[in-house]
């Protein structure tokens, strides 16, 4: 829906910094409406820092300075962020059934779920997000992010790279016109010794790759399910029948062969030579004590693992926290299945509780350990869902269509203000 510019603050190109001008972000397409008279006005530079500086690994300032303003003091600089955990809800989660319910709207808009009160007066969440509702005084929620493309391919590309696609693309397209935020972060802020700067658990989203930055900035993908009792990251530990010393001898032999002129010349002409980077990356992980420790979830007490939830998403969130502790700059937590054209209510009854538990525990755990000051947690998808519920002719299997005109995005940590809800949709959620 168009935003009333007399009653909002819009981001425009005059605020774009060097990273944006390089094609990483086009903030002119985002608008964050703020009611006139708000105690917390937004300026363009402030909004850009929320969406750009942190995700690109740059310096993060106490952007809004809100706590300092309330206390009558000067805004303080937050410490340089060390990590970002990017919770990607693939398919486009419904804002109605998550962070922006409309309890007073007609039933065909509000849906089946009830809404519940949160820690902030007048702000309500879905009934299935009870843990996050009880702690929303510890994160910022933006309810008015939007763009203009309702196809998955273009929407994902835009949200993961900050740039529109060069031409219209369909829902099933895999587009990579620009490097992703994770790849840019890995290039600007390399990972700790022996570890990549960019991990994806359990898979890389479409448009989540490095594009022209090169394969060395692609995410290291961890497909294994850490919720399984036999979880073992196969690329981090050598095969059980092969010791690390034998792996090292193989590596030396491979290096000697690569130095042969004909092998070297053939490799130089072969685009597949990027596999060398992955081979070396795997070896570095095998020989890194920090990596071995980060992936050893058995070091965690059962109480901590239970708190995150004994689900694939919950245990991956715990693994993400351990990677943050190891110094990894960017971790994507991929959770699919949010494209709810049909069966939206039974689907989300199953999906929301694990998300609620994992995300709330992750934020709380990082905060308790003093890591939230230097870790940005972001939760989002490629778009929201349409206001009006659609049904098959039989009246069964209701769902919601794609809606790029409004979505909710959660930000926690790295100096982002606590307890703020920015922007708004109208009474119908459009």
What role is predicted for each listed range?
Residues 2-430:
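Ligand-binding pockets and gating/stacking loops
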């Amino acid at each position: 829906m168009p935003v009333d510019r007399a009653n909002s603050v819009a981001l425009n190109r005059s605020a774009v910094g060097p990273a944006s001008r390089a094609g990483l972000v086009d903030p002119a397409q985002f608008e964050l409406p703020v009611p006139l008279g708000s105690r917390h006005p937004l300026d363009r530079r402030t909004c850009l820092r929320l969406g750009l500086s942190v995700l690109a690994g740059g310096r993060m300032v106490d952007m809004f300075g809100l706590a300092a303003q309330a206390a009558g003091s000067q805004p303080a600089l937050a410490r340089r962020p060390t990590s970002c955990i990017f919770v990607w809800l693939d398919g486009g989660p419904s804002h109605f059934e998550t962070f922006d319910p409309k309890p007073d709207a007609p039933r065909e808009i509000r849906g089946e779920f009830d809404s519940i009160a949160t820690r902030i007066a007048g702000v309500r969440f879905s009934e299935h997000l009870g843990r996050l509702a009880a702690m929303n005084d510890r994160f910022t929620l933006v309810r008015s992010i939007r763009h203009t493309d309702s196809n998955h391919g273009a929407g994902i590309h835009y949200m993961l790279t900050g740039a529109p696609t060069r031409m219209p693309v369909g829902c099933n397209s895999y587009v990579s016109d620009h490097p992703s935020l994770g790849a840019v972060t890995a290039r600007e802020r390399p990972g700790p010794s022996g570890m990549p700067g960019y991990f994806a658990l359990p898979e890389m989203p479409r448009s989540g790759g490095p594009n022209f930055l090169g394969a060395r900035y692609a995410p290291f993908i961890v497909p294994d399910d850490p919720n399984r009792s036999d979880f073992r990251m196969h690329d981090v530990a050598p095969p059980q029948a092969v010791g690390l010393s034998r792996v090292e001898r193989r590596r030396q032999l491979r290096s000697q062969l690569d130095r042969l002129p004909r092998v070297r010349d053939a490799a130089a002409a072969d685009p597949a030579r990027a596999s060398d980077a992955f081979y070396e990356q795997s070896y570095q992980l095998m020989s890194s004590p920090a990596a071995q420790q980060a992936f050893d979830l058995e070091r965690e007490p059962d109480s901590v693992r239970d708190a995150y939830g004994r689900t694939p998403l919950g245990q991956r969130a715990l693994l993400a926290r351990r990677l943050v502790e190891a110094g990894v700059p960017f971790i994507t937590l991929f959770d699919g299945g949010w494209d709810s054209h049909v069966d939206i209510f039974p689907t989300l009854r199953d999906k929301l509780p694990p998300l609620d538990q994992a995300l709330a525990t992750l934020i709380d755990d990082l905060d308790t350990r003093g890591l939230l000051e230097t870790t940005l947690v972001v939760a989002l998808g490629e778009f929201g869902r349409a206001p009006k519920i659609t049904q098959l002719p039989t009246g069964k299997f209701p769902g919601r269509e794609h809606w790029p005109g409004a979505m909710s995005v959660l930000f926690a940590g790295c100096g982002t203000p606590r307890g703020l809800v920015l922007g708004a949709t109208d009474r119908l959620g459009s």
